[in-house]
Amino acid sequence: MKNVTDSFVSLGHWPSAGSFGFNTDILATNPINLSVVLGVLIFFGKGVLSDLLDNRKQRILNTIRNSEELREGAIERLEKARARLRKVEKEAEDYIVNGYQEIEREKLNLRNSIGKNLERLENYKNETIQFEQQRAINQVRQRVFQQALQGALGTLNSCLNNELHLRTISANIGMFGAMKEITD
């Protein structure tokens, strides 16, 4: 504390002008010494400070240039990615549309195929029914004919004697012979 008070006391006292030198006591220096020190600092420090500032400026400019290049590269990659995305979205949309169209086509083909199969089955069923009806009719006719024939033979056998029987057979043979000649 004593040094601080001594420094303030020495401010009021001017040293004698016997020699030129630097006073290292900052509080005891006069404005001329301060201006000389500041002038020397500015003269010599200006180049160093200017170099430091120029280096810093160059580093900042290089960083900005690199950032700009990186930004441009990122923008370019982003545009390429967007273009690929649009292309992929379009392809996906085309696949979806084509898929739906294919599904509709397959449904239509399936419906047509089912319709044709049903129609064939219906025709087969109708043909089978007709065939079975015709067969049943033929069986009924054959039974009716056999029964009628047996009934007629029974009636003829009971009603006819041998001579009448032989004449009827001869007449029938003659009729069948005439029919055969007509058909030939």
Swiss-Prot record:
Q: What does this protein do?
A: F(1)F(0) ATP synthase produces ATP from ADP in the presence of a proton or sodium gradient. F-type ATPases consist of two structural domains, F(1) containing the extramembraneous catalytic core and F(0) containing the membrane proton channel, linked together by a central stalk and a peripheral stalk. During catalysis, ATP synthesis in the catalytic domain of F(1) is coupled via a rotary mechanism of the central stalk subunits to proton translocation.
Q: Which UniProt keywords apply?
A: ATP synthesis, CF(0), Chloroplast, Hydrogen ion transport, Ion transport, Membrane, Plastid, Thylakoid, Transmembrane, Transmembrane helix, Transport
Q: Which InterPro entries match?
A: ATP_synth_b/b'su_bac/chlpt
Q: Which protein are we looking at?
A: ATP synthase subunit b, chloroplastic
Please provide, in alphabetical order, the Gene Ontology terms of the cellular component aspect for this entry. chloroplast thylakoid membrane; proton-transporting ATP synthase complex
The miscellaneous comment for this protein is: In plastids the F-type ATPase is also known as CF(1)CF(0).
CDD domains found in the cross-reference section: ATP-synt_Fo_b (cd06503)
